[in-house]
């Protein structure tokens, strides 16, 4: 499982990044939404705004796309 964190440098981005960095047993990738990598990822996954969390399985299938912290916590519970 790969947790992708698209950030914008705001408080919400920091909270999401901090939570995801603390998750055990998952790969994590943090990207600045304004970077070329971030823009490419957003285009590829239909993300129109950041911050955003996109969780992918091993095959690249989207399991979760959210900015909602409660939804994120529930998913990993």
Mark where each language-model region is.
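Flexible, glycine-rich phosphate/dinucleotide-binding loops
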Residues: 11-12, 37, 62, 72
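Non-catalytic, surface beta->alpha helical segment in thiol-disulfide oxidoreductase systems
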Residues: 55-77
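Structural micro-motif
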Residues: 45-55
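Thiol-based oxidoreductase modules, predominantly thioredoxin-like and allied folds used
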Residues: 4-8, 25-38
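N-terminal beta-loop-helix "entrance" segment that forms/cooperates
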Residues: 38-45
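Generic recognition of short, well-ordered alpha-helical segments
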Residues: 14-18, 40, 67
């Amino acid at each position: 499982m790969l947790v992708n964190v698209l950030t914008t440098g705001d408080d919400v981005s920091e909270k999401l990044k901090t939570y995801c960095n603390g998750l055990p047993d998952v790969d994590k990738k943090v990207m600045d939404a304004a970077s070329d990598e971030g823009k490419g990822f957003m285009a590829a996954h239909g993300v129109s705004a950041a911050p955003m969390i996109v969780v992918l399985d091993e095959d690249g299938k989207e399991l979760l796309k959210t900015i909602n912290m409660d939804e994120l916590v529930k998913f990993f519970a």
